[in-house]
Amino acid sequence: MAEPGLEGSQPVDLSKHPSGIVPTLQNIVSTVNLDCKLDLKAIALQARNAEYNPKRFAAVIMRIREPKTTALIFASGKMVCTGAKSEQQSKLAARKYARIIQKLGFPAKFKDFKIQNIVGSCDVKFPIRLEGLAYSHGAFSSYEPELFPGLIYRMKQPKIVLLIFVSGKIVLTGAKVREETYTAFENIYPVLSEFRKIQQ
């Protein structure tokens, strides 16, 4: 069963995606409160897939294969889950981590699950004149090619940060719901078309 939003899985709904391009979700960051204090040392010693180096970072780093994700688990009971490719997978992964903690003997709950950031990407399949774009959209753009090869575009509505590369590859970050990713891309697409590089 293909995830919604994966390229080539189904025809694009042009009423939602007039550009004909649907950004692919690459990473979901979510948080949840296990609502109990945790002994990180005990977790690291008992769990197979966990590492804990308190001198470097004050959390247990735990990984599972399915959905392929990484969790940061803090002594306060707060947990961050990264790496899932959809909202449902992020929640499923977070539940699996909570279950692992429960099996180790902690009274872990599953409170206030929240998607914090959605990262998407796509390819408009044409090169873009970043200098021109940066110049005409100066209020939203920062472009310093000697520091970073992409143009950073801070969209106000929805509040999304886009990384725009000369190749036509786009990364969109900062969404809390996937619709914001899609809206931001549809907003920027006409601008990208306007600054399309004409191939000699």
Swiss-Prot record:
GO molecular function terms listed in the Swiss-Prot or TrEMBL record: DNA binding; RNA polymerase II general transcription initiation factor activity
Top-level taxon of the source organism: Eukaryota
GO BP field: DNA-templated transcription initiation
PROSITE patterns, A to Z: TFIID
Major location category of this protein: nucleus
Entry-linked InterPro entries: TBP, TBP_CS, TBP_dom_sf, TBP_eukaryotic
Keywords associated with the record: DNA-binding, Nucleus, Repeat, Transcription
Location(s) in or outside the cell: Nucleus
Sequence ranges of the Sequence repeats: 25-101, 115-192
Protein family (similarity comment): Belongs to the TBP family.
Name of the protein in its database record: TATA-box-binding protein 2
Keyword Transcription included in the entry's annotation: yes
Functional note: General transcription factor that functions at the core of the DNA-binding multiprotein factor TFIID. Binding of TFIID to the TATA box is the initial transcriptional step of the pre-initiation complex (PIC), playing a role in the activation of eukaryotic genes transcribed by RNA polymerase II.
Signal peptide: none
Subunit record text: Belongs to the TFIID complex together with the TBP-associated factors (TAFs). Binds DNA as monomer.
Pfam families: TBP
Family annotation (PANTHER family): TATA-BOX BINDING PROTEIN
GO cellular component labels: nucleus
